[in-house]
Amino acid sequence: MLTGSELPLVDENALVAEALLEISNKGLGMTGVIDNQGILIGIFTDGDLRRILDARIDLHTATVTQVMTKGGKTTMPEQLAVEALNLMETHKISALMVTDETRKPVGAFNMHMLLKAGVL
């Protein structure tokens, strides 16, 4: 699981181009979007990117909040990995943010990490 400075996060005012840099730098295929209090308000994924490219939205002027998945699926630290895997399979997503009870991000992981850990 990625934590701390490895956690892919952008501010709600970030441009899409900035979110793409965060996705590329952190290598998880998504980034969380947080408000000014550090609360997760959405997730921007490579799937969101494909949709905005199809809609011909300008990556350098659009903000990530205009195109993100609002809310997004999350898990909590105490949830079992197999339960998180079931959530991912049910919703056909490949990565999850881990949040505390106030929806502040504390970690993130993807299917590859679960496979490497022997959960799959």
Predicted regions and their residues:
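Tandem CBS (Bateman) regulatory domains
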Residues: 1-6, 40-94, 101-120
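Oxyanion-binding "anion nests"
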Residues: 1-38
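Short loop/turn microsegments at loop-to-beta-strand junctions
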Residues: 28-29, 93-95
